[in-house]
């Protein structure tokens, strides 16, 4: 019986079906805009700069000089487990993040760079609360934030070459728990979603 969906229409369908199945889904722990991008392929009207902090921040960055364009050169998409995992290993191999003192501004620069070059909407790099080690909410991201001891902070502050505005000289002023945090790579974070185990309440829709 002839219908629009005849056998000839199914040519190539197995490949399309495979691609649909393999299409990456947003990683657990991403923000509301990334969930929109996964579900609808676009940012919906429920997320605006007035209702979403990350969108408001991106709008603000448009008007600020940050050293590179803040408009993505590729389509905006949600961070996936595989992309977070690959990015973690790329940054570990290239160096620059491991052991770097964390600050909100440094996170913003990293988020903007990833958004600009890869298109991943910058609501994926969030961490559990302190005190102590902060684990990433986004499953696949293998960098956690680890507090330095007072002795480590004092050693890092020795000498005359320290800038007062450097995050380590702020002695944790930016942190609610007054801890100086550094990024640390931990490959186990790709296997165990520690943030979800410790804080299941963060993952309720």
Curated annotation (Swiss-Prot):
Site (Cleavage): 57-58
InterPro entries cross-referenced by the UniProt entry: HIV-1_Nef_anchor_sf, HIV-1_Nef_core_sf, HIV_Nef
Sequence motif: PxxP, positions: 72-75
Annotated stretches, region: Mediates dimerization, Nef-PTE1 interaction: 108-124
Chain ranges for the short sequence motif Dileucine internalization motif as given in the UniProt record: 164-165
Modified residues (Phosphoserine): 6
GO biological process: symbiont-mediated suppression of host antigen processing and presentation of peptide antigen via MHC class I; symbiont-mediated suppression of host antigen processing and presentation of peptide antigen via MHC class II; symbiont-mediated suppression of host autophagy
Family, similarity comment: Belongs to the lentivirus primate group Nef protein family.
Complex and partners: Monomer; cytosolic form. Homodimer; membrane bound form. Interacts with Nef associated p21-activated kinase (PAK2); this interaction activates PAK2. Associates with the Nef-MHC-I-AP1 complex; this complex is required for MHC-I internalization. Interacts (via C-terminus) with host PI3-kinase. Interacts with host PACS1; this interaction seems to be weak. Interacts with host PACS2. Interacts with host LCK and MAPK3; these interactions inhibit the kinase activity of the latter. Interacts with host ATP6V1H; this interaction may play a role in CD4 endocytosis.
Domain notes: The N-terminal domain is composed of the N-myristoyl glycine and of a cluster of positively charged amino acids. It is required for inner plasma membrane targeting of Nef and virion incorporation, and thereby for infectivity. This domain is also involved in binding to TP53. The SH3-binding domain constituted of PxxP motifs mediates binding to several Src family proteins thereby regulating their tyrosine kinase activity. The same motifs also mediates the association with MAPK3, PI3-kinase and TCR-zeta.
Chain's role: Factor of infectivity and pathogenicity, required for optimal virus replication. Alters numerous pathways of T-lymphocyte function and down-regulates immunity surface molecules in order to evade host defense and increase viral infectivity. Alters the functionality of other immunity cells, like dendritic cells, monocytes/macrophages and NK cells. In infected CD4(+) T-lymphocytes, down-regulates the surface MHC-I, mature MHC-II, CD4, CD28, CCR5 and CXCR4 molecules. Mediates internalization and degradation of host CD4 through the interaction of with the cytoplasmic tail of CD4, the recruitment of AP-2 (clathrin adapter protein complex 2), internalization through clathrin coated pits, and subsequent transport to endosomes and lysosomes for degradation. Diverts host MHC-I molecules to the trans-Golgi network-associated endosomal compartments by an endocytic pathway to finally target them for degradation.
UniProt name for this protein: Protein Nef
Organism: Simian immunodeficiency virus (isolate CPZ GAB1)
């Amino acid at each position: 019986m002839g219908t629009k969906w005849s056998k000839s229409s199914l040519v190539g369908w197995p490949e399309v079906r495979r691609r649909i199945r393999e299409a990456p889904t947003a990683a657990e722990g991403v923000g509301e805009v990334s969930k929109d991008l996964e579900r609808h392929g676009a940012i919906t009207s429920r997320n605006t700069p007035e209702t979403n902090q990350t969108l408001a921040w991106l709008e603000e960055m448009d008007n600020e000089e940050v050293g590179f364009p803040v408009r993505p050169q590729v389509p905006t998409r949600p961070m996936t487990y595989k992309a977070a995992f690959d990015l973690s290993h790329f940054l570990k191999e290239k160096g620059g993040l491991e052991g770097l003192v964390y600050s909100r501004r440094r996170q913003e620069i990293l988020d903007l760079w990833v958004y600009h070059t890869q298109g991943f909407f910058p609501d994926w790099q969030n961490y559990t609360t302190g005190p102590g080690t902060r684990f990433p909410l986004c499953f696949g991201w293998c960098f956690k934030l680890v507090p330095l001891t007072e002795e480590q902070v004092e050693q890092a502050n020795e000498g005359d070459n320290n800038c007062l505005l450097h995050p380590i000289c702020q002695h944790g002023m930016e942190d609610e728990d007054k801890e100086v945090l550094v990024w640390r790579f931990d490959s186990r974070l790709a296997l165990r979603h520690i943030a979800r185990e410790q804080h299941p309440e963060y993952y309720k829709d």
